[in-house]
């Protein structure tokens, strides 16, 4: 059985968030939260929040044991991009792209139906 949680429009580049997501993919939920607790990245607490939400969804909706859960899938997709301009010399302007991410976490207890 699987449970899912999604965080949308997280204001950080997907490229940077994927670096943290790759560290916890396939790990036990408690082990993944332990790893994220000590990472110095801005994305780590947000990914931990989504994993905790997926864990709570599994417990509440499907009565799955939280100790047996594994991070089966963690996807980081591109969200909307905010376009801003930075003034430059001689009246020019450069476009700045402020990227955002959608983080999807699927946890599984490994049980086959």
Curated annotation (Swiss-Prot):
CDD domains linked: Ribosomal_L22 (cd00336)
Keyword Electron transport set for record: no
InterPro entries named among the record's database cross-references: Ribosomal_uL22, Ribosomal_uL22_bac/chlpt-type, Ribosomal_uL22_bac/org-type, Ribosomal_uL22_CS, Ribosomal_uL22_sf
Gene3D superfamilies given in the database record: Ribosomal protein L22/L17 (3.90.470.10)
GO biological process: translation
A GO cellular-component term linked to this record: cytosolic large ribosomal subunit
Keywords: Ribonucleoprotein, Ribosomal protein, RNA-binding, rRNA-binding
Family matches, as Pfam families: Ribosomal_L22
A GO molecular-function annotation: structural constituent of ribosome
Subunit structure: Part of the 50S ribosomal subunit.
Homology family: Belongs to the universal ribosomal protein uL22 family.
Function according to Swiss-Prot or TrEMBL: This protein binds specifically to 23S rRNA; its binding is stimulated by other ribosomal proteins, e.g. L4, L17, and L20. It is important during the early stages of 50S assembly. It makes multiple contacts with different domains of the 23S rRNA in the assembled 50S subunit and ribosome. The globular domain of the protein is located near the polypeptide exit tunnel on the outside of the subunit, while an extended beta-hairpin is found that lines the wall of the exit tunnel in the center of the 70S ribosome.
Name of this chain's protein: Large ribosomal subunit protein uL22
Organism, scientific name: Herpetosiphon aurantiacus (strain ATCC 23779 / DSM 785 / 114-95)
